[in-house]
């Protein structure tokens, strides 16, 4: 019998993946909303536009799933630090490989697991940058320029993200053609 992991990874159509995620949310009550779709779209556009040599389908799927155990209460710091690990454990039960689960777990740096996967660096960029572009209960969305500066000089200060320079180039291209 096919696992959920095999099922969603076999599907390469983005819209159909979104539909699969919608039904997974209904069945398991995972975290899945428009912010997840927005960040996954950033991943997809980044990989395609910059011609990144990586398994796009796997990374987009990971972006859709990496926050599956996220909570809406951003005030609980312990939950913020543990949701990626809890999500990776949950994904393992759905049949995802150790590598895939590690990619999802490493999308934030709280797991402290090394070496980091390149795919995790892409998730980290889309998650943090995309999050800054969205309104939150505690703040309004940042303008693109400010979000990019904060990403580099605050969020990823003293962090080695393999794709940061390419991501900045991508955002500047997107900004010029006024996609956002």
What do these predicted ranges mean?
Residues 70-72, 131-134:
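Short small-residue beta-strand/loop micro-motif enriched in glycine and branched aliphatics
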Residues 45-49, 90, 154:
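A generic secondary-structure signal
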Residues 1-84, 179:
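Acidic/His-rich, divalent-metal-binding segments that scaffold phosphate/diphosphate chemistry
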Residues 32-36, 90, 118:
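Amphipathic alpha-helix face/heptad-repeat signature
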Residues 59, 63, 91-125, 130, ...:
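Histidine/acidic-rich helix-loop-helix segments that form or flank divalent-metal centers
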Residues 87:
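Alpha-helical segment that forms one wall of the substrate-binding/catalytic cleft
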